[in-house]
């Protein structure tokens, strides 16, 4: 499974949004209705799923689904 698909599944599960709304350009706050607590929980779930730690200063830069996917992809390089 591609990283985008894994991230998308986590977002759909955690936020209860329609999978069609989860695109790389989708903003967690503006498009998916996430608040800061939702985003913190998403970051923790991504850390668990991908076996990594996302520093707070990096987590603050994750505003869109694409940001999250790019962060994960860069870890794997």
Swiss-Prot record:
Pathway named in the protein's UniProt entry:
Lipid metabolism; fatty acid biosynthesis
Q: Which GO terms describe its molecular function?
A: acyl binding; acyl carrier activity
- Domain Carrier, residue spans: 1-76
Q: Which domain of life is it from?
A: Bacteria
Name the major location: cytoplasm
User: What keywords tag this UniProt record?
Assistant: Cytoplasm, Fatty acid biosynthesis, Fatty acid metabolism, Lipid biosynthesis, Lipid metabolism, Phosphopantetheine, Phosphoprotein
Which family, according to UniProt?
Answer: Belongs to the acyl carrier protein (ACP) family.
Its recorded name reads Acyl carrier protein
Lineage at the top is: Bacteria, Bacillati, Bacillota, Bacilli, Bacillales
**Gene that encodes it:** acpP
């Amino acid at each position: 499974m591609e990283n985008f698909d894994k991230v998308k599944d986590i977002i759909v599960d955690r936020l209860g949004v329609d999978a069609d709304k989860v695109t790389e350009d989708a903003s967690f706050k503006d498009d998916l209705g996430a608040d800061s607590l939702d985003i913190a929980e998403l970051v923790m779930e991504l850390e668990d799923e991908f076996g990594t730690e996302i520093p707070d200063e990096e987590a603050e830069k994750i505003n869109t689904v694409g940001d999250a996917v790019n962060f994960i992809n860069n870890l794997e390089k």
